[in-house]
Amino acid sequence: MEEITLDAVIEMLEDVKEGVDYRNATALVDNREIDSFDILAIISAIDDEFDLSVPAKDIVPANFNSTQSLCALINRLAEEE
């Protein structure tokens, strides 16, 4: 699978929840810009958009706090496939 770009992840996130500055945010979970329901929607979107499953061990705030960390998670999962 090709490397997933930051822009592709931002586009996916904007489909899940609009009105958030995903490009510059570094504490999406910590600042409550996204909540647990949003995280579930993001996990579902990752499955739909990239055909990847997020294991329970990776559902931690650090992986969802920034677009960069989420992009890194998605690319790691893609490499492991």
Predicted stretch roles:
Residues 57-69:
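AMP-binding/adenylate-forming catalytic domain of the ANL superfamily
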Residues 40:
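Conserved catalytic core of two-component sensor histidine kinases
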Residues 1-21, 72-81:
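Thiotemplate assembly-line natural product biosynthesis machinery
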Residues 14-33, 52-60:
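Phosphopantetheine carrier-protein modules
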Residues 36:
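Catalytic nucleophile serine of serine hydrolases
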